Amino acid sequence: MKNYLLQIEYFGRNYCGWQRQSHSPSVQEELEKALSKIANQNIEVTCAGRTDTGVHATSQIVNFYSDAERPLSAWQRGVNALLPQDIKILAVQQVDNNFNSRFTAINRTYNYIIYNSATSSPIFAEHCLWENRELDIDKMNQACEYLLGEQDFSSFRSSQCQSNTPFRNIQKAEFIKQGSFIVFEVVGNAFLHHMIRNLVGSLLKVGLGFESPEWIKVVLEAKDRTQAAETAKAHGLYFVGVEYPEFSFKRQIIKLFC
């Protein structure tokens, strides 16, 4: 039995998220269906981060076990031929049998993309959040400083979150402006359900001048979801990287745009 690692890219608009669902299309279901056909046996996959409905990935990492003797090209080109156009395998390699894409991961990186312009873009409308009002990135980055380290993120956790603990360790949270795009890059050991989108929704209030940077600290300490802002839309969020002890994978979405 061999263990294979796949680097996956997908556009999440047409899916209920990563995780297999009984009555809705999912990325996991499409991938497992294609892999199983190539392997001529049932294949189940594990992913580094389970993305929500409408969320995308430029570098999702997946692993699966199979005793089917296939060249690596079959696991990539062969499977890609069976996958829909909005899901593709970028790379494949054999890894140690102890490797687990979820539990071996040290941290995960997400990008949230905001198109900050007076006029919306027909090209980027489905790829990022449009905000026509000017955002104060300096204040947003001041607010981000309160997010760093291991903390209780109950205020930014959805009511459907099934995690046993609200504590997460954030190593990086930063807004970067590139032309009309503003990229929120956040790196953490793991994330709660809707956590990043809830953070973005609140940080936008700071950027628009409705709240001070210190307000984020107050919301964190409240440990109450009702104290934070509304959830930012899913289509601006991208899973872009994973770090493991032996290697890392990262494809920043903004570099694909520019």
From Swiss-Prot:
What the entry lists under InterPro entries is as follows: PsdUridine_synth_cat_dom_sf, PsdUridine_synth_TruA, PsdUridine_synth_TruA_a/b_dom, PsdUridine_synth_TruA_C, TruA/RsuA/RluB/E/F_N
Q: What is its EC number?
A: 5.4.99.12
Q: Where is the active site?
A: 52 (nucleophile)
Sorted keywords for this record are:
Isomerase, tRNA processing
Q: Which Gene3D superfamilies match?
A: Pseudouridine synthase I, catalytic domain, C-terminal subdomain, Pseudouridine synthase I, catalytic domain, N-terminal subdomain
Its top-level enzyme class, in one word, is: isomerase
Which Gene Ontology molecular function entries are recorded, alphabetically? RNA binding; tRNA pseudouridine(38-40) synthase activity
Positions binding substrate in this chain are 110
Reaction(s) this enzyme catalyzes, per UniProt: uridine(38/39/40) in tRNA = pseudouridine(38/39/40) in tRNA
Gene Ontology terms: biological process: tRNA pseudouridine synthesis
Quote the HAMAP family the UniProt record gives: TruA (MF_00171)
**Assembly behavior:** Homodimer.
Q: What does this protein do?
A: Formation of pseudouridine at positions 38, 39 and 40 in the anticodon stem and loop of transfer RNAs.
Q: What family is this protein classified in?
A: Belongs to the tRNA pseudouridine synthase TruA family.
Write the protein's name: tRNA pseudouridine synthase A
Organism listed in the record: Francisella tularensis subsp. novicida (strain U112)
The gene behind this protein is: truA
